[in-house]
């Protein structure tokens, strides 16, 4: 590999760990996590959380992959890329990747039969996409699109770029038809669009050959009982000491039975686990932590409540239908629910 200085952007994103209440680390080591299905590789896209623009711990949006963003009244967004940023295979990440997504994917009837992603459409009108230079792209609409930036920051983000240098080999506009036909037959898909979709799905994270901007790279072809993710040598973040992130060399995703994951986690077979754990697992996980030297944390969730009741407003019984449609009844029902007792009995007094 080239020296680190040649593998990171000219102005990388510097992460101040001390400001986050953490300490700088060192390179090395690996993390074991447990998953139940091969397609759970997509969760590495969630956990890695490299986004064009992302949420910080205070839930404020800030540039991440992007160097900066100009927002004009939620109608025009000018995105500035980081000079020198590269895909995980070392190829430059530029506005050409945004052009490819828009012109060759979003506007292609074979790849996007229903048109561009809905977050790029406002009142039936798609975005105007301007490639201003190698590092600058602008998206604009006649009316405000307040959902654009949050969509880019989502757990399953809105992708508006794709690795053009890799995906063109599967696109009818760039590849010889005879070669495409061979690839289609080998992959067992219906046409070149199916081929392009299979090998180009960034969120699924199941194609080791697909270049990525995430902190770790999938190195394992499915199906497998273990997926190995290795550190991206071209990742765009560094710590305040100049060490390239992430610190961890490898993440090992071990596939097993969903019902056994809480027990395995309690036995210390996972270094970091949230998926497939429930609140009723909490007592024995705490006990397992005391035996095996790990900590169990509770975190706030973005949902309104752990459970919800939905009275049937369309009951066939006219008397019952009239009752539940009366707002006074629904308010009384809400007041009658003993939330504290439910908390103590069902949730161990933790919510």
Q: Where are the regions a protein language model picked out?
A:
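Extracytoplasmic/periplasmic ligand-capture domains
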Residues: 54-57, 68-78, 82-117, 122-130, ...
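Generic secondary-structure transition motif, activating predominantly at the C-termini of alpha-helices
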Residues: 1, 9-12, 21, 35, ...
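Surface-exposed binding/hinge segments that line
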Residues: 117-196
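N-terminal short leaders/motifs
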Residues: 10-35, 77-87, 92, 166-179
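Edge beta-strand plus adjacent loop/short-helix module at the start
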Residues: 32, 45-48, 52, 179-211
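Selective for proline/serine-rich intrinsically disordered segments
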Residues: 1, 7-10, 115, 161, ...
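Structured beta-strand-rich cores of soluble
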Residues: 156-161, 165-172, 200-204, 211-216, ...
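N-terminal lobe/hinge region of extracytoplasmic solute-binding protein
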Residues: 2-73, 197
């Amino acid at each position: 590999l080239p020296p680190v200085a040649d593998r990171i952007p000219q102005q990388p994103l510097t992460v101040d760990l001390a400001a986050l209440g953490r300490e700088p680390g060192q390179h090395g080591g690996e993390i074991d996590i447990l998953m139940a299905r091969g397609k759970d590789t997509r969760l590495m896209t969630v956990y890695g959380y490299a986004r064009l623009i992302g949420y910080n711990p205070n839930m404020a949006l800030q540039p991440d992959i992007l160097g900066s963003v100009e927002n004009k009244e939620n109608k025009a967004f000018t995105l500035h890329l980081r000079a020198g940023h590269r895909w995980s295979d070392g190829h430059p990440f530029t506005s050409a990747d945004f052009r490819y997504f828009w012109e060759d994917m979003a506007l292609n009837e074979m790849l996007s039969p229903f048109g561009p992603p809905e977050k790029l459409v406002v009142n039936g009108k798609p975005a105007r996409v301007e490639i201003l230079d190698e590092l600058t792209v602008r998206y604009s609409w006649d009316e405000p699109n307040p959902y654009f930036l949050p969509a880019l920051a989502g757990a399953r983000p809105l992708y508006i770029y794709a690795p053009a240098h890799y995906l063109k080999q599967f696109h009818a506009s760039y590849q010889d038809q005879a070669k495409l036909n061979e690839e289609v037959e080998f992959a067992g898909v219906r046409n070149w669009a199916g081929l392009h979709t299979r090998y180009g799905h960034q969120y699924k994270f199941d194609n080791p050959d697909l270049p990525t901007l995430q902190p770790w790279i999938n190195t394992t072809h499915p199906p497998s009982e273990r997926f190995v993710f290795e550190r991206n040598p071209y990742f765009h973040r560094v710590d305040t000491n100049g060490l390239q992130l992430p610190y961890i060399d490898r993440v090992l995703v071990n596939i097993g039975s969903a019902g056994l994951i809480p027990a395995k986690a309690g036995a210390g077979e996972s270094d970091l686990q949230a998926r497939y754990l429930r609140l009723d697992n909490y007592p024995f996980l705490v006990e397992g932590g005391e035996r095996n030297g790990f900590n169990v944390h509770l975190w706030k969730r973005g949902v309104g409540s752990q459970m919800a009741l939905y009275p049937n407003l369309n009951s066939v019984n006219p008397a019952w239908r009239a009752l539940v449609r009366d707002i006074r009844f629904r308010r009384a029902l809400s007041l009658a629910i003993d939330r504290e007792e439910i908390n103590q009995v069902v949730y161990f007094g933790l919510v």
